[in-house]
A protein has these predicted regions:
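Active-site segment of metal-dependent pyrophosphate-handling enzymes
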Residues: 52-96
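Conserved Nudix-box catalytic region and its N-terminal flanking loop in Nudix hydrolases
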Residues: 16-54
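Conserved N-terminal beta-strand and adjoining loop/helix that marks the start
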Residues: 1-21
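Short, solvent-exposed coil/turn elements at secondary-structure transition points
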Residues: 31-34, 64-69, 107-109
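Short, hydrophobic/aromatic-rich beta-strand segments within well-structured domains
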Residues: 12, 21-24, 88-92
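Nudix hydrolase/Nudix homology domain
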Residues: 26, 91, 96-124
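Aromatic-acidic/polar surface patches that form glycan- and anion
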Residues: 4, 32-36, 102
Length: 124
């Protein structure tokens, strides 16, 4: 299963295979589509935003899907019309050298998300 997987508290994990995930650092491997933007326009915008990164060439992956608007914070949903129910999400990858710190095992990533949830609940 490739593509983007939403986890709570704003943690996005790109599932690479059954075992490893990519944790986004400063290089965003995904983008929320903007109004009137198709996957090609989104890819061009991402390439412009990441120009000068020096870490490889941005490669567009297939359109990932639409996610429920309620999963996103208000500063994102406010950019869209009030009546919309879902927001398009596109995934990308960088060709070139990968940074090992960006790759962790899927089970470790799940533990990180669970810990974040417990910490947040503890402080509420």
């Amino acid at each position: 299963m490739n593509g983007i997987q939403y986890e709570s508290f704003g943690v996005y994990l790109v599932l690479l295979d059954e075992e490893y995930v990519f944790l986004p650092s400063s290089r965003l491997p995904f983008s929320l589509g903007k109004k009137g933007e198709n996957p090609q326009k989104c890819a061009l915008r991402m390439k412009r935003e990441l120009t000068g990164d020096g870490e490889g060439r941005l490669v567009s992956l297939p359109y990932v899907g639409r996610m429920d608007k309620d999963l996103f914070p208000s500063f994102i949903t406010s950019l869209w019309a009030p009546g919309i129910k879902t927001i398009p999400v596109y995934a990308f990858k960088m060709e070139g050298e990968r940074k090992e710190r960006d790759w962790i095992r899927l089970d470790e990533a799940r533990k990180m998300v669970e810990k974040a949830e417990k910490d947040v609940l503890f402080f509420i």
